[in-house]
């Protein structure tokens, strides 16, 4: 059992899940600062959730055929980059694109992370 790799995978999982859960916490600031409607704010949450939910089984099929450990750092990066760029623009369509990108990052991480955790945990 490789405790170092288990710790790294656990930390990576924490980071990706925090990214997915951070959007609802950020929304009140976006609503107040940019006068978003509740519908527009909810659409951002929907985009993040749906992109993750639709893409994750596809990434699972892709990584089941052959190990793709590079999906783990790419997924963590995309999840973080997607949400961190929310503050760089005030255009709604860019927010929608970045939260969708974040959802795809979360989706890319999970299947390969589960496979690798099973491998390193024995």
What do the predicted segments below correspond to?
Residues 4-40:
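Helix-loop boundary and gating motifs at the non-cytosolic
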Residues 9, 93-99:
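Short hydrophobic/alpha-helical segments at membrane-entry points of transmembrane helices
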Residues 21, 49-57:
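Residue-level signature of mid-helix packing/kink "hotspots" within the transmembrane helices
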Residues 28, 57-61, 114-115:
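Small-residue-mediated transmembrane helix hinge/kink sites in multi-pass secondary transporters
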Residues 33-34, 65, 116-121:
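Helix-to-coil boundary motifs at intracellular loop junctions of multi-pass secondary transporters
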Residues 42-49:
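Short hydrophobic/aromatic, small-residue-rich stretches within specific transmembrane helices
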Residues 54-93:
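Conserved MFS/SLC helix-loop-helix module at the cytosolic interface between two early adjacent transmembrane helices
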Residues 98-122:
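Cytoplasmic helix-loop-helix junction between adjacent transmembrane helices
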